[in-house]
Amino acid sequence: VTFPQSLRGPFLFGAVLGLLVFTLYASVAFSGVAAWMIGLIYIAYDTLLLGFMVVSSQVAVNRQARRRALPPSPRTGPRPTVTLLVCARNERLVLPECLRALAAQTEPADEIIVLDDGSTDGTADWLVAEYAMTFEPTGTARIGRSAAWPALRIFSKPNSGKADSLNHGWRLARGEVVITLDADTVMVPGAVAAIRDGFADDPRLGIAGGVLVPICQRTASAGFFQFFQTFEYARGFLWRQVFAQYDMLVLISGAFAAYRRSVLESAGGFDVDSWVEDYELTHRIYQKSFDAGRPVTVKIIADAQGTTDAPARVTSFLNQRRRWFAGFIATHFKYHDMVANDRYGRVGRYMMCIKTLDLLLPVYALAAAVVLIMLLSIRHWLPLFIIKVIIIKLLYDLFLHAYSIFLYQRWQGIPLSRKLWLQSIGATLTEPFVFQILRQLGAVFGWLAFLRRSIDWQPQRPVATAEPMYDSPSS
């Protein structure tokens, strides 16, 4: 008897939810080690996953090193044209740095369109003055062209959201490859060339992502968030390379993403109702391409690098993670038919199952911490076995996290840094007690936002008034 495909996703989620309820019951009904069953289950899953990711990262980095060691092969075929879309709403302070980086590219984009989504901080006026823009009125929107930089255009319209702005942008685009870029993302000089090479080398490549390093504004808590997010991003992008080598990558950062225009058009563009339009689009492209019998590949391009603004305050961090997780939940439930579905290759067979577990993983982690505190404060008791497990897990994480930073540096071609290794040790030892709790809280808030079907977008930075409030990232 074949289990109905439409029920596989809900059944797996129900099983994970049922286990959560049972382990919470065990924390009050049982004694001994069984009282912290929820923590042991979480640690077991996290241990297996981390081990798999680090071993697989070693394989991915070795492959990358072998490719870099080979002499470059001559390219005889045509290379794709590139349109770069820069999304901007009240980004007057960061847009100049972004555009300077685009002008400094070793292989500039054939076309750059700044999508001004109803900015009220003078973004459009600054572009007009800085780049000698002249406008052609188009209904309520305006299209401007630069006399100083022929490749640069601006599409200025009333505020309608990022997804709608991107849809206007790619429909205006003339390039065969469309790169989407946030206005606070600063590319390294070879980033566009790396994207162009990636699409030229792989005709099946439908979506590609760059590698980003977070830069935090200058605030009282900036050092804290810069420290932890640096290692979070490094591991996260390395893990994406792992999933890409197994043909099951579903997460590409919209702050620096690239799409083959024909694939984007076939999928119908970005969903204006999604809280995470980039993540939702990747799922839809996978679904449509597999259904059509022409599955695309999704990759991370290691040499397409850049920096991006990251939250530097507790409130902005929690707002960001709440929106991300609420969007993740909504997207996963929307495409639940892909869960455990061989029709969608390894994405359906494995990745969608992993993501089903991830829906409740932060709840498991936070509940495990609460139960542990309860055992200590109410029962004044903790089995020696649990203490040993926690210590062993910290040592395990310490070694593998430090080694993953070594692998990340090799993968990115960064000179090996002893200082970074030592910092990674400090991050590993302290992250579970501070930063990880903030991440899990953001995910729980995401669940609440999803259940209420309501979430407000909040800017990470104050709207520009005069002087920048952050350290400009260097490319």
Can you describe what each PLM-predicted range is?
Residues 41-44, 49-109:
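N-terminal signal-anchor transmembrane helix
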Residues 59, 136-167, 171, 175, ...:
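Long helical/loop segments within the catalytic core of UDP-sugar-dependent glycosyltransferases
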Residues 80-83, 111, 265, 280:
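Cell-envelope/extracellular polymer assembly enzymes that use nucleotide-activated donors
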Residues 100-158:
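Acidic donor-binding segment of Leloir-type glycosyltransferases
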Residues 178:
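Short aromatic/hydrophobic "clamp" motif used to bind/position activated sugar donors
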Residues 263-266, 274-299:
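A short, conserved alpha-helix in the catalytic core of glycosyltransferases
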Residues 296-316:
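Active-site donor/metal-binding and catalytic loop motifs
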